[in-house]
A protein has these predicted regions:
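NTP/phosphate- and nucleic-acid-binding module
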Residues: 1-91, 96-637
């Protein structure tokens, strides 16, 4: 058996490993948290049978290592809460992308800042106790009896839904939790912790269920790593799109209208319009055909598409009109297919590329709604490509290149790409899956784009490529999806007439480059911290007359900029110049044009750049050339 520990590889005979734990073989090294035993995550306390071929130790740099570290910390937090508040009930506490959370039934009590400090102190105490963490496997019935005895009803509910007869709990000191694991060997492995916040949640995310209290936290192997993370978090708070959206007057959400339904204010709408015009122009350049489709469709359409059978819980309730049932659309695809089907298509017509900025509505539980990132009404930059088998490789390559072009234009430079393959339950022949998956991989290989395989994570109707972008703080944001669909062409009987005169099924490729406008806008706000590049800025220039006697000249400058299609505002108030400059800086307007007596007499303007300062005097023509060049340069700012 091979034991891989970083760069070090050791070989063991079968007789040397039987009955021994991984920890015994690896040595007491608190830099490693979990092991992959022949590819399966296991506790370091796992006892080997002698049949294993390879054991790989994982540290905090691995995803599984981090998950294990954070999941154990969530158990430590739950233990701390139970020791301080024994009357509260535990529910679930997973590791998440950045840290962990645990939900507690507090019977209506809301955790305070002081509570979080006390829980944190108690966690440090539990860590110092160096409690061994033990995995116990037992019959489900015994586990139910155990949790009944200690009054943890949520655990019983979970157990009743587990089909397995043998389940596992993890025990540290007097605290035990139902869990699949894996976990750290000992509480002392956790070194640096911070509880970040508490908020309300609902059992299973359903507002009809019990209201819970959720505590979020983070932990690291060193204090330095924790401090670095907290610094990033502080910066992220300053960039929070919900805060900046309000400060910069970009969008709002109103209880009277409904959660997850966005109002785009004039400044937000100005940015959206720029993105829309750019998006349409670039699509028309690449032979996409722009379409528009209605917001509602008859129930018959959604029956054919399968949405009523498989997606109804995510749809808004039906409406009835003239004895017909209608639904607000959750997706644009069926409409694009109906456009395709309005005439017989020849093999010569393909590929056909329809694109639309289509607004869709999906029911998301209120507990998961989050600013612009998770909403109920949103606009997708949708396109559907109908192609012959011999065209799919080139089509995928062109879509990937197009995605990179678009995202680069907005200033993004770091990407991660994933190919999701066939899940257990799927539609479409194995041959179609193989051909489509191969086309996705070959396209990326030919473009020299590195990617990771997300095994079995494709949708049931086809494999896909996902492109995520990284922002200045290293956070990942989901953007582009390129998705094959073997389901809808069958359901709608989509065909083209091939050169042999036989009707054949085209490949259907769904793709969205930005994802949704709302989510992409949130990403842009946080990426730039509200300091949008000039071409995107809702107001590009603020004209600031120093006094009332300069307003007439300032108006001429304002009109000239307007005539040159510059998004401009003018501050005619009687405030002092410094106050006007401060206001423009707060609004993050890229350029300020200051006009006073000297500028008026010399027919010049004084130019100031946001966060940079004074650029000196120049003619209006020189200033226009300056900003037009910058706008042409796109994301440079």
């Amino acid at each position: 058996m091979k034991l891989v520990k970083g760069q070090e590889v050791k070989d063991f005979l079968q007789s040397e490993v039987v009955g021994r734990s991984i920890l015994e073989l690896a040595g007491e090294d608190q830099n490693y948290f979990v092991a992959l035993v022949d590819g399966i995550p296991k506790d370091l306390t796992y006892r080997l049978t002698g049949n294993e071929k390879e054991v790989v130790l994982l540290d905090f740099n691995s995803e599984i290592g981090r998950e294990t570290y954070w999941h154990t910390t969530s158990h430590i937090m739950a233990q701390a809460v139970k020791e301080l508040f024994p009357q509260f009930k535990v529910t679930i506490g997973p590791a998440i992308e950045n840290g962990f959370y645990y939900d507690f039934d507090t019977n209506g009590y809301n955790f305070t800042e002081e509570d979080l400090r006390n829980i944190e102190d108690k966690m440090r105490e539990i860590i110092k106790r160096s409690l061994p963490i033990e995995r116990i496997e037992l019959p489900k019935g015994e586990a139910i009896e155990y949790f009944k005895k200690i009054g943890e009803n949520y655990k019983i509910e979970i157990l009743n839904e587990i089909p397995d007869e043998i389940v596992s709990i993890y025990k540290q000191g007097d605290f035990a939790d139902l869990c699949r694991g894996p976990h750290l060997p000992n509480t002392s492995y956790v070194k640096a912790i911070k509880l970040l916040s508490s908020s309300g949640s609902y059992w299973r995310g359903d507002e009809n269920n019990a209201r819970l209290q959720r505590i979020y936290g983070i932990s690291f192997p060193t204090e330095e790593q924790l401090q670095e993370y907290l610094n990033k978090l502080e910066e992220a708070k300053k960039r929070d799109h919900r805060v900046l959206g309000k400060e910069l007057d970009l969008f709002s959400v109103h209880e009277e209208i409904g959660p997850g339904l966005i109002l785009w204010h004039p400044k937000g709408a100005a940015i959206r319009r720029v993105i829309e015009e750019f998006w349409i122009k670039e699509h028309l350049k690449r032979d996409y055909q722009l379409v528009y489709t209605p917001h509602v469709g008859r129930s018959k359409l959604w029956e054919i598409s399968g949405h009523l059978n498989y997606y109804k819980e995510n749809m808004y309730p039906q409406m009835e009109l003239d004895n017909q049932q209608y639904y607000i659309k959750p997706m644009n695809c069926p409409f694009h297919i109906m456009i395709y089907k309005t005439k017989v298509r020849s093999y010569r017509d393909l590929p056909i590329r329809y694109c639309e900025l289509g607004t869709v509505y999906r029911y998301e539980r209120s507990g998961v709604l989050h600013g612009l990132l998770r909403v109920r009404g949103f606009t997708q930059d949708d396109a559907h490509i109908f192609a012959r088998p011999d065209q799919i490789l080139d089509e995928i390559k062109e879509v990937v290149k197009f995605a990179y072009y678009i995202l680069n234009r907005f200033g993004f430079k770091e990407y991660e790409v994933f190919v999701s393959t066939r899940p257990k339950d799927s539609v479409g022949s194995p041959e179609m899956w193989e051909e489509a998956t191969k086309a996705l991989m070959n396209a990326l290989n030919e473009l020299n784009i590195p990617y990771k395989i997300d095994e079995g994570a494709g949708a049931f109707y086809g494999p896909k490529i996902d492109i995520t972008i990284k922002d200045a703080l290293g956070r990942s944001w989901q953007c582009t999806t390129i998705q094959f669909d073997f389901n809808l062409p069958e359901r709608f009987d989509v065909t083209y007439r091939d050169k042999d005169g036989i009707d054949k099924r085209p490949y259907l490729i769904h793709r969205a480059l930005l994802g949704s406008f709302e989510r992409f806008f949130a990403t842009l706000i946080e990426y730039y911290g509200g300091n949008f590049p000039l071409w995107l800025a809702p107001i590009q220039v603020a004209v600031l007359p120093i006094s009332e006697e300069n307003v007439e000249y300032a108006d001429k400058i304002y009109k000239a900029l307007k005539d040159n299609e510059i998004r401009v505002t003018i501050n005619r108030s009687d405030e002092k110049l410094n106050a006007k400059i401060r206001d423009a800086e707060i609004e993050k307007i890229p350029y300020m044009v200051i006009v006073g007596k000297k500028e008026r007499e010399q027919n010049l303007v004084s130019v100031r750049k946001h966060s940079v300062g004074d650029l000196g005097k120049m003619t209006l023509e020189q200033f226009l050339n300056l900003i037009k060049e910058e706008i042409k340069g796109g994301y440079t700012h």
